[in-house]
């Protein structure tokens, strides 16, 4: 390919819409162009990158025994209604684009394909003799993101590889799950990414176990916690730890203490010289359940800890055996709309009476009471007295009549002691999720009534796994991890071209002829090469070459008459002046050892 024929439009200025480096570089280097909010065109250079990533993914999936297929992007609503996910994915802040056809039938644009593939498996996989089966596809997905951002990191349309496996036993599922784990590690290594596998929450997909693969980068949206001994890593949503010990309160009787204007933990502790770990703070929420019930929550947490919203949602779902569509804080405005008496925000205790919910228009009449382990373990503590500007000092759980359900509801954080090794502590890193694997169990096969006949002639639901890789996100994550001040530094395996021959002055016959000869020789050696034959200044060509990030560059310049060229490695900026034949030999050896 010649640059003179390539659709390459580079930008010198940073586009205002781009917040993170990788997004800026992909726009500036002419890889992508924004069409709408969260919608991008993949231009020729980017399409080559995506094709190379796809080739690696396809090779490793095939090597692991998976079979490629292609599923429809339009999904009948009935399938999602049968699984129980239609309401959660389309109502409120649901992420599924949905529409009606001209007959009024509801359809959704697939953000994921569990329902479709499980329905098909129920029709096609009748006997245990056909199992296990692992099917994958690579195609465009759609998600109605509330706030698309960061380019391809969080878009409304994106390319994804998703695989679904079907098994006759849980043991067989675990075996395939392990094989997919190894395949993913090979994929990310081959793509030149430093990806960390971490324990993860299963989220809306569900299932018994899941693991994310995170590319570590300062611009990552996710916080991951990693033990300093390297034996544990988890997403913040899932991470567990041993918190620091609470400061004990002095012995003494319970007393009520006026606290006018001290409605926050910070102001309360600063004014009274209390330690936040001595306080039980109480947070109120309303959870919208999948049966449209609005369930008030009363959650107790030690004052020096942060609540983990994902753990709260999971706790509600497990406790009530219902899905949670939404969970939002109760505010004074919210209580006013319910037409109930004012709640003493800033002075709420864990024994707040259900009476405050009397007369609520749509809420359930009682709280679901939950407490984090850090709060429940306190022998004595400070808490709100359920009256404005009043707190109780040295109270205890024995004085609380309605005991909460105790669970892990807090955020683990850097510096916490690890549960697996008391000598190890957690550290924080930012990460970009590029892959996620799940053991789904029988969640979907039971809901979809999809199963097989076992060796005893009885019908039972499939054991299932699912395995996703964000192909387009992976491409941008690679840029986030591999760039410098001048532009992108693509890993060779996924670069749009392996090498670029830059002719400094194409109007110089000697330079032009040597450039053409090098280009032809590299093509003959099966090198994926680009020739910059434009009638541009040499400085422009060098800047563009740095910006687009081709791993190797051969510069044909003023020494062309002597047969000397420069061989430049983009990632290290190492420059070697060599006879052209030696430069070609060195390059081929580096690319195809």
From Swiss-Prot:
Main location group: cytoplasm
Protein name: Proline--tRNA ligase
Uppermost EC category: ligase
GO MF annotations, alphabetized: aminoacyl-tRNA deacylase activity; ATP binding; proline-tRNA ligase activity
Gene: proS
NCBIfam families cross-referenced by the UniProt entry: PRK09194.1, proS_fam_II
Source species of the chain: Synechococcus sp. (strain CC9605)
Role according to the record: Catalyzes the attachment of proline to tRNA(Pro) in a two-step reaction: proline is first activated by ATP to form Pro-AMP and then transferred to the acceptor end of tRNA(Pro). As ProRS can inadvertently accommodate and process non-cognate amino acids such as alanine and cysteine, to avoid such errors it has two additional distinct editing activities against alanine. One activity is designated as 'pretransfer' editing and involves the tRNA(Pro)-independent hydrolysis of activated Ala-AMP.
Subunit structure: Homodimer.
Domain description: Consists of three domains: the N-terminal catalytic domain, the editing domain and the C-terminal anticodon-binding domain.
Catalytic activity: tRNA(Pro) + L-proline + ATP = L-prolyl-tRNA(Pro) + AMP + diphosphate
């Amino acid at each position: 390919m010649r640059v003179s024929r390539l659709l390459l439009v580079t930008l010198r200025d940073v586009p205002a819409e781009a917040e993170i480096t990788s997004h800026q570089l992909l726009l500036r280097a002419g890889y992508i162009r924004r069409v709408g909010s969260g919608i991008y065109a993949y231009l020729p250079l980017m399409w080559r990158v995506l094709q190379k990533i796809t080739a690696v993914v396809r090779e490793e999936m095939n090597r692991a025994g998976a079979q490629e297929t292609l599923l429809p992007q339009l999904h009948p609503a009935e399938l999602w209604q049968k699984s129980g996910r239609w309401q959660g994915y389309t109502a409120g802040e649901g992420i599924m684009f949905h529409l009606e056809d001209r007959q009024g039938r509801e359809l959704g644009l697939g953000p994921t394909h569990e329902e479709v593939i499980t329905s098909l498996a129920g029709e096609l996989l009748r006997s245990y003799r056909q199992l296990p089966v692992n099917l994958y596809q690579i195609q465009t997905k759609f998600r109605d993101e509330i706030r698309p951002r960061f380019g391809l990191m969080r878009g409304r349309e994106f390319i994804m590889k998703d695989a679904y496996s079907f098994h006759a036993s849980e043991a067989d599922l675990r075996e395939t799950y392990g094989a997919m784990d190894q395949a993913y590690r090979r994929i990310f290594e081959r793509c030149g990414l430093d990806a960390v596998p971490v324990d993860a929450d299963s989220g809306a997909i569900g299932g018994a176990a899941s693991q994310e693969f995170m590319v570590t980068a300062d611009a990552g949206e996710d916080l991951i916690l990693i033990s300093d001994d390297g034996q544990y890593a988890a997403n913040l949503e899932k991470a567990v730890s041993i918190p620091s010990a609470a400061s004990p309160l002095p012995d003494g009787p319970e007393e009520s203490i006026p606290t006018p204007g001290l409605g926050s933990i910070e102001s309360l502790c600063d004014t009274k010289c209390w330690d936040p770990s001595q306080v039980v703070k109480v947070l109120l929420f309303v959870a919208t359940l999948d049966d449209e019930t609005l369930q008030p929550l009363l959650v107790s947490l030690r004052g020096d800890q942060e609540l983990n919203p994902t753990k709260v949602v999971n706790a509600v779902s497990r406790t009530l055996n219902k899905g949670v569509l939404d969970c939002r804080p109760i505010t004074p405005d919210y209580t006013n709309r319910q037409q109930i008496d004012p709640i003493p925000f800033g002075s709420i205790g864990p024994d707040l009476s259900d009476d405050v919910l009397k007369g609520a228009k749509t809420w359930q009449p009682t709280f679901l009471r939950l407490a984090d382990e850090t709060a429940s373990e306190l022998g004595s503590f400070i808490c709100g007295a359920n009256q404005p500007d009043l707190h109780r000092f040295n109270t205890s759980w024995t004085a609380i009549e309605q005991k909460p359900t105790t669970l892990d509801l807090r955020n683990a954080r850097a510096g916490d002691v690890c549960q697996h090794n008391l000598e190890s502590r957690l550290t924080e890193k930012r990460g970009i999720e590029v892959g996620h694997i799940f053991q789904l169990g029988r969640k979907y096969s039971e809901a979809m009534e999809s199963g097989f006949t076992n060796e005893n002639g009885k019908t039972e639901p499939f054991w299932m796994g699912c395995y996703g890789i964000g192909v387009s996100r992976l491409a941008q994550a690679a840029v986030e991890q591999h760039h410098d001040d001048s532009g992108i530094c693509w890993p060779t395996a996924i670069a749009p071209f392996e090498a670029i021959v830059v002719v400094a002055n194409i109007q110089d016959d000697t330079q032009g002829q040597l450039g053409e000869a090098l280009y032809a020789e590299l093509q003959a050696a099966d090198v994926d090469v680009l020739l910059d034959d434009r009638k541009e200044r040499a400085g422009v060509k060098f800047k563009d070459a740095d910006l687009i990030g081709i791993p190797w560059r051969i510069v044909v310049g003023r020494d062309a008459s002597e047969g000397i060229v420069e061989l430049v490695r983009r990632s290290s900026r190492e420059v070697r002046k060599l006879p052209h034949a030696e430069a070609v030999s060195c390059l081929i050896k580096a690319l195809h050892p």
